[in-house]
Swiss-Prot record:
It is an enzyme of class 2 (transferase). CDD domains: OAT_like (cd00610). The gene is rocD2. Catalyzes the interconversion of ornithine to glutamate semialdehyde. The modification N6-(pyridoxal phosphate)lysine is found at residue 255. Its main location: cytoplasm. It comes from Staphylococcus aureus (strain Mu50 / ATCC 700699). Pfam families: Aminotran_3. Its cofactor is pyridoxal 5'-phosphate. It catalyses: a 2-oxocarboxylate + L-ornithine = L-glutamate 5-semialdehyde + an L-alpha-amino acid. InterPro entries: Aminotrans_3, Aminotrans_3_PPA_site, Class-III_PLP-dep_AT, Orn_aminotrans, Ornith_aminotrans_bact, PyrdxlP-dep_Trfase, PyrdxlP-dep_Trfase_major, PyrdxlP-dep_Trfase_small. It comes from the Bacteria. This is Ornithine aminotransferase 2. GO terms for biological process: L-proline biosynthetic process. Its EC number is 2.6.1.13.
């Protein structure tokens, strides 16, 4: 039995089976490349679901983490830490928002945004108590906690978890008329992924996000953009909402915000929204901790200094066009923005992901029939060409 096989056996024996990973163990990683315990090398084309946009173990981020670990790692929010203010300023200026509320995971940030929207609805908009509604979209994925599960359109995500939470409506993604019909006097917010990731890299129709912005303005409704996966350069823009030149009332960020070395998420909004929180109304012991802030400050610097959105845009266009040239009866469509690309098949994508793994390329199926390609944004054109060679070989 190999070391990898032993690790997988232990994992399957002791771990809850809430994931179905490819049969590979990763023990080392740097940049775009990872290794298993046997020394086999693989190209990472998933980036931990876009948490590693800056590449594995980016030296600037790792050094920031090490330096901070030598000083202080956690004080809780009972006291001030010396880098939280610096992080607040950096992320707020980057997003063009007044205030930030840090959490740890993407789902926590979504829950935070939903709580903010409801309290804003009652305290600012004046909706009758316990009547506020939030509109989401079919195909959405906002996390695995109870509120995101309750607003999901996937039956399997909800099975066995009832009773689900009330106060959510769902409409079809891309349908302006359906959204217009769903908005009423009790609508507090519209929650949308500018690009639906888990649904199969679904790109909204041109002008759709702008239409959401206009409807929200017309009806005094908060526009909440879940940019956890598509944001911070992944789509070829700093924020995926930038594709329609719109600014949401609320940004939700996570994943690459911590550079792939420490979990951190954030809700960003102006004072009118985040000032609804008062001491004791929301919190997190680890939210905005010194280690997370140190990693995030460095992670944001890397995104800006190395122009990762620009790299993603240029290389993503090239990669997408090359993928479109692969002639295979199983390929239904190639779509995406930046280095956030889905190859939709007429059959299950899992066998193709397994075959690509054997070729030394790691990716993951999403929504059963879509292969998601989302490499670290530091990838080179030469590395993309190598990936294309492997992809062509599998489809041949």
């Amino acid at each position: 039995m190999t070391k990898s096989e032993k690790i997988i056996e232990l994992t399957n024996h002791y771990g809850a089976h809430n994931y179905l990973p490819l049969p590979i163990v990763i023990s080392e990683a740097e940049g775009v490349w990872v290794k298993d315990p046997e020394g086999n090398k693989y190209m990472d084309m998933l980036s931990a679901y876009s948490a590693v946009n800056q590449g594995h173990r980016h030296p600037k981020i790792i050094q920031a983490l090490k330096d901070q670990a030598d000083k202080v790692t956690l004080v809780s929010r009972a006291f001030h830490s010396d880098n939280l203010g610096e992080w607040y300023e950096k992320i707020c200026k980057l997003a063009g928002k007044d205030k930030a509320l840090p959490m740890n995971t993407g789902a926590e940030a979504v829950e935070t945004a939903l709580k903010a929207a409801r309290r804003w609805a009652y305290d600012v908009k004046g909706i009758e108590p316990n009547k506020a509604e939030i509109i989401a979209f079919n195909g959405n994925f906002h996390g695995r906690t109870m509120a995101p599960v309750s607003l999901s359109s996937e039956a399997e995500y909800q099975r066995g978890y009832g009773p689900l939470l009330d106060g959510f409506r769902k409409v079809d993604f891309g349908d302006v008329d359906a959204l217009k019909a769903a908005i009423n006097e009790n609508t507090a917010a519209v929650l949308v992924e500018p690009i639906q990731g888990e649904a199969g890299i679904n790109i909204p129709p041109e002008g759709y996000l702008k239409a959401i912005r206009e409807l929200c303005d017309e009806h005094n409704v908060l526009f909440i953009a879940d940019e956890i996966q598509a944001g911070l350069g992944r789509s070829g823009k700093l924020f995926a909402t930038d594709w329609d030149n719109v600014k949401p009332d609320v940004y939700i960020l996570g994943k690459a915000l911590g550079g792939g070395v420490f979990p951190i998420s954030v809700v960003l909004a102006d004072k009118e929204v985040l000032d609804v929180f008062t001491p004791g109304s929301h919190g997190s012991t680890f939210g905005g901790n010194p280690l997370a802030c140190a990693a995030s400050i460095a992670a944001l610097d890397v995104i800006v200094d190395e122009d990762l959105p620009g790299r993603s845009l240029e290389l993503g266009d090239y990669f997408k066009e090359q993928l479109k040239q692969i002639d295979h009866p199983s390929i239904k469509e190639v779509r995406g923005r930046g280095l956030f690309i889905g190859v939709e098949l007429n059959e299950s994508a899992r066998p193709y992901c397994e075959a690509l793994k054997e070729e030394g390329l790691l990716c993951k199926e999403t929504h059963d029939t879509v292969i998601r390609f989302a490499p670290p944004l530091i990838i080179t054109k030469e590395e993309l060409d190598l990936a294309l060679e492997k992809i062509r070989h599998v489809f041949q």
